[in-house]
């Protein structure tokens, strides 16, 4: 059996410059906020995701797609550049309490063999981390996910995202990110996708210290995501995180959020977003070169 490794989703430099287009109801809300006619149709999301894959995958080492809105269409339309690997989201988002993702389970409809036949090289699992929920349940889900990936020769990517506890109102996001890393940073996955400390804000030295604390607890290669980070601050965030030990990024919003809801999205993705992604890829290569 052909077994993929993280080297199959990196750039030649060994760094990760990966694009996420697997946002689901959150993306629908972004379109609604941008003034798209309500209710925002599934086809609006699918078209945007497929167009993003076509316009941006030449500049990404991998692209993360979701089953619900775009996996089949992306495969059928050959939307992903040959130089770019496909990652498929293996998480099912369960809405509740007024938010689009209140809990997450492994998507039982996932077919790893089919994904591999379609050119997929990795699966991704979102893990919501709350201090007052059962750690063992999270660890068990990650273990099952890792086995699902590795038994089919696919790369396992976990994405712990911290949330306020179910009960009580005390929430220290920064400490929660560290606590999640302590719990899941040595869980047997191949790659750890993490929220940027401090939302990428503040003095560089503070950001670096926070990122180094994170690095101390993650015993696998790790990359940052861009949700919650101002897109103008994201290139610096990539530099700082990589100085601390990260190996790149897997990000969506910092690349394409500014064109959601604009006309001519194919053109916008090509003219506005592609240069951003190219610049981020250059930063990854530059930071990897410093390690040699």
Swiss-Prot record:
Cleaves 6-deoxy-6-sulfo-D-fructose 1-phosphate (SFP) to form dihydroxyacetone phosphate (DHAP) and 3-sulfolactaldehyde (SLA). This is Sulfofructosephosphate aldolase. SUPFAM superfamilies: Aldolase. Homotetramer. Transmembrane segments: none annotated. It comes from Escherichia coli (strain K12). It comes from the Bacteria. Its EC number is 4.1.2.57. Belongs to the aldolase LacD family. GO terms for biological process: 6-sulfoquinovose(1-) catabolic process; 6-sulfoquinovose(1-) catabolic process to glycerone phosphate and 3-sulfolactaldehyde.
């Amino acid at each position: 059996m052909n077994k993929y490794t993280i080297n199959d989703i990196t750039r030649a430099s060994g760094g990760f410059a990966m694009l996420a287009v697997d946002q689901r109801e959150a993306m629908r809300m972004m379109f609604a906020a941008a003034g798209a006619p309500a209710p925002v149709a599934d086809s609006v999301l699918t078209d945007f995701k497929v167009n993003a894959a076509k316009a941006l995958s030449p500049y990404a080492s991998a692209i993360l797609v979701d089953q619900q809105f775009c996996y089949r269409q992306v495969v059928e339309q050959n939307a992903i550049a040959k130089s770019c690997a496909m990652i498929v989201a293996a998480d099912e988002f369960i809405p509740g309490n007024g938010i689009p993702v209140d809990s997450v389970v492994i998507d039982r409809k996932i077919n790893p063999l089919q994904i591999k036949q379609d050119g997929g090289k990795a699966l991704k699992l979102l893990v919501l981390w709350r201090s007052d929920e059962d750690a063992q349940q999270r660890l068990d889900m990650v273990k099952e996910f890792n086995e699902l990936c590795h038994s089919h020769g696919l790369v396992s990517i976990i994405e712990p995202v911290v949330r306020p506890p179910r009960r009580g109102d005390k929430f220290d996001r920064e400490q929660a990110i560290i606590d999640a890393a302590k719990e899941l940073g040595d869980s047997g996955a191949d790659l750890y996708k993490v929220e940027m400390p401090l939302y990428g804000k503040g003095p560089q030295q503070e950001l670096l210290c926070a990122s180094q604390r994170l690095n101390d607890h993650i015993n696998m290669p790790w990359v940052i995501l861009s949700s919650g980070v101002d897109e103008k601050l994201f290139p610096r965030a990539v530099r700082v995180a990589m100085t601390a030990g990260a190996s790149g990024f897997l990000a969506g919003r910092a690349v394409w959020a500014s064109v959601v809801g604009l006309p001519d999205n194919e053109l916008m993705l090509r003219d506005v977003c592609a240069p951003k992604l190219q610049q981020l890829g250059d930063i990854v290569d530059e930071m990897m070169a410093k390690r040699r």
